[in-house]
A protein has these predicted regions:
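Acidic/polar surface patches and capping/hinge elements
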Residues: 100-130, 145-149, 398-440
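Peptidyl-prolyl cis-trans isomerase
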Residues: 50-54, 85, 143-186, 197-204, ...
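Stable alpha-helical elements in mature extracytoplasmic
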Residues: 32-40, 56-61, 65, 70, ...
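Sec-dependent N-terminal signal peptides
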Residues: 3-14
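FKBP-type peptidyl-prolyl cis-trans isomerase
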Residues: 20-43, 69, 74, 120, ...
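Extracytoplasmic and endomembrane cell-envelope/extracellular-matrix remodeling and assembly machinery
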Residues: 214-223, 246-306, 325-327
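N-terminal targeting/tethering segments
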Residues: 18-104, 108, 295-402
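Hydrophobic, helix-prone linear segments
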Residues: 1, 17-25, 29-41, 47, ...
Length: 480
């Protein structure tokens, strides 16, 4: 079975989808049309409800309602005293950061139409480029001086940098993700043999680029032109989001100074590398799949200072607490041992950055923001429902492994009946918009959607495997 991966950037509009089309209301819980679609489309559905027909859509709806009912049934027994979930705390804070950035950064983006026109003129070119990436600023300055003196790009690469070959890349308008690099190539028209640079990239390396050649492919039909224009606008918006995000982060972190304790840092980096390589504990090659608790390692003391922030000391215990709710995220994929120390440092700096964003979000009451709470409720109800399910299985002498291996057997012999009893019990409190359900169209393609570069990459919880019944003989039919 092929599963398609749908990558959703954190800045993508999906994260901020506002949906007032209520499909189901149960007490204070709601399931919207958008909830139904993303819970169905952005994770893997069981075979018994993969299609778009009415029977399968009703099974999906029953499953989502069952998840809410299980969560409601158990919520009175859950408190901070008997249940603390760092995963849910982390999910909530991730949504808080998302909506903070949406409001203070992304919603204010307005790209000049004249700038868009300049990009459109160059967006149909595909370049063959030579490039060199220089980590050292003094070396980059020297190269810039040599170019200013009229020395050829190739001669600099051969005689001054001792390169045996010059790296090459083919680049179209939609390839590059670094705003500075993209702007240097596509904002203005470039000619063959033109050299540009130094361009300061996001990884703080200095790029020099020479145009080897390019191909211009004009569009013919009005549909091609319209589609391409929309794609260019979307690409420019995404690049501008990255640029404005960087500006905002630079502003809020300008008075923050982090100094790492080198001895302790080396120990932690070694432990993190072993955890990453030996256990392969990365999701999508970037996010650690579970919290690495440094203070439980024999070589590390719980109270060792790992860094100072603005002169204040923070120990390994503090770092563990942060990581427990915010798994480390690495900027790069396929990290070698040689570069792991630097990538580990970046991951810690990004962790501190996100904690600063959390501080601003809490200060501005994003912990009680309606949109944050709605999105968080999807994950919290899914988690509570899972706790309820595990308790049910245990009380009826089923193991979780048994259920995962053959869920339909347990659903048929036990769970359907239990879910039926909850549906009957809450029937007067359940309102369903069947007209809206009938309008929904689904695909039968297996997709797994995730966001890149965040501690919790899943867009939605896994599909709730709780019932395979399509009959809806409970609740009240309404049009919200």
């Amino acid at each position: 079975m092929k599963i398609k991966l749908l990558i959703v950037l954190i800045i993508n509009s999906l994260v901020f989808a506002i949906d007032n089309n209520i499909l189901v209301e149960i007490n204070d819980r709601v399931i919207t049309k958008n909830d139904f679609i993303i819970r169905s489309e952005y994770t893997i559905r069981p075979s018994y409800c993969k299609s778009n027909n009415q029977i399968h859509k009703k099974i999906i709806l029953n499953s989502l309602i069952a998840e809410k009912l299980l969560a409601i049934e158990i919520e009175d027994y859950i408190s901070e005293e008997n249940f603390s979930d760092n995963f849910l705390n982390g999910i909530k804070e991730q949504y808080m950061r998302d909506y903070l950035l949406k409001d203070v950064v992304y919603s204010k983006i307005d790209i000049n139409p004249m700038v868009i026109e300049k990009y459109l003129e160059n967006s149909l070119k595909v370049y063959d480029l030579y490039f060199i990436s220089i980590p050292s600023e003094p070396v980059a300055n020297s190269i810039n001086m040599l170019l200013a003196q009229g020395i050829e790009f190739e001669d600099i690469c051969r005689d001054y940098l001792n390169l045996k070959g010059i790296p090459e890349i083919k680049m179209d308008f939609f390839y590059e993700k670094d705003p500075a690099i993209h702007e240097s190539i596509f904002l203005n028209s470039l000619s063959k043999d033109q050299v540009i640079g130094p361009v300061l990239a996001k990884d703080n390396k200095h790029l020099f680029i020479k145009v080897k050649d390019f191909v211009y492919s004009p569009l013919i039909t009005s549909n091609e032109i319209s589609s391409h224009t929309n794609m260019v606008n979307q690409k420019l918006y995404e690049l501008t989001q990255v640029k404005e995000y960087d500006i905002y982060i630079k502003e809020i972190m300008k008075d923050y100074s982090v100094v790492f304790n080198s001895d302790v840092f080396v120990k932690l980096a070694s432990e993190a590398y072993n955890y990453y390589i030996d256990r392969n504990n990365l999701i999508n090659d970037q996010v650690l799949s579970s919290s690495l608790i440094f203070s439980k390692r024999d070589s590390i003391n719980y109270y060792d200072e790992i860094f100072t922030l603005n002169g204040n000391s923070y120990n390994v215990s503090y770092l563990d607490n942060l990581i427990s709710k915010h798994p480390l995220v690495f900027r790069n994929q396929n990290i070698s041992r040689k570069e792991f120390g630097m990538q580990f440092k970046y991951a810690l700096v990004d962790l501190i950055r996100d904690e600063r964003l959390n501080e601003i979000a809490y200060k501005n009451n994003y912990d009680i923001n309606d949109d944050v709470l709605k999105d968080y409720r999807i994950f919290s109800d899914a988690t509570s429902s899972k706790l309820h399910l595990e308790a049910l299985l245990k009380n009826n002498n089923f193991s979780l492994d048994q259920f995962n291996q053959n869920p339909e057997s347990i659903i048929d012999n036990y769970l359907n009946q239990y879910i039926d009893s909850l549906q009957a019990s809450y029937s007067d409190n359940i309102k369903i918009n069947f007209n809206l359900l009938n309008e929904i169209e689904l695909t039968d393609i297996d997709l797994y959607a995730y966001k890149k570069g965040v501690p919790y990459p899943m867009v939605v919880p896994v599909f709730p495997v709780l019932t395979n019944k399509s009959v809806i003989d409970y609740g009240k039919e309404v049009n919200f």
